[in-house]
Regions:
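A short beta-strand-loop structural module common to alpha/beta enzyme folds
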Residues: 48-62
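N-terminal beta1-alpha1 ligand-phosphate binding loop
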Residues: 2, 16-49
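Short, flexible hinge/linker loops that cap or flank conserved catalytic cores
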Residues: 14-15, 113
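Hydrophobic/aromatic beta-strand patches that form the interior of the parallel beta-sheet core
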Residues: 22-24, 50-52, 79, 120-122
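Helix-loop-strand module that forms the ligand-binding subsite of alpha/beta enzymes
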Residues: 66-150
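Generic recognition of short, well-ordered alpha-helical segments
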Residues: 34-38, 63, 91-95
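Short histidine/acidic/glycine/proline-rich micro-motifs that form metal-
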Residues: 28-30, 56-59, 139
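C-terminal and late-domain segments of enzyme folds
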Residues: 2-3, 7, 152
């Protein structure tokens, strides 16, 4: 069950004109968020920024693929905002990748919808920076966990 209290509202008022920013927030527990919630609030309502609370919009995990592809197509920049959980993206964000970034649309034959777009990661961890060092708790520098995003 996902925390539905204190969920931010999506900003889907159509202010994401071609060349805008599409910020996708995927935090399953907003009440516990110290950073993601504030970052989402700061971006919400800014001109040219469309925001999506992924868990708030799709609590049943039934993603509207066509609507999401249209939002991505309208954006010049896609920002993924979420905590790192078990050294990876939260489950609903992964499902979003699998269902929205499809063969023939995002990649493969004629899959050029992402061409010319930028992707920024705005990810947070529950541990301090020094825990992401060789010999420390997480054993690796944080960048070692980023190749799956780079390949996507």
């Amino acid at each position: 069950m996902h925390d539905t209290s204190q969920r931010p509202s999506d900003d889907d008022k159509g202010n994401n004109k071609q060349g805008g920013i599409y910020l996708i927030a995927a935090h399953p527990h907003w009440r516990e968020s110290r950073v993601n919630r504030r970052m989402f609030a700061a971006a919400s309502g800014l001109p040219g920024v469309t925001t999506l609370d992924l868990y708030g919009r799709y609590p049943d995990y039934h993603i509207d693929v066509h609507a999401e592809q249209a939002r991505v197509e309208a954006a010049r920049l896609v920002v993924l905002l979420h905590p790192i959980q078990w050294y990876a993206t939260p489950p609903l964000q992964k499902l979003w990748f699998d269902e929205v970034l499809t063969w023939g649309w995002a990649y493969g034959t004629d899959g050029n919808a992402l061409r010319g777009k930028d992707l920024w990661l705005a990810v947070t961890t529950g541990g301090p920076q020094d825990s992401y060092q060789p010999g420390s708790y997480n054993r690796y520098v944080f960048d070692a966990f980023l190749p799956p995003y780079e390949q996507t």
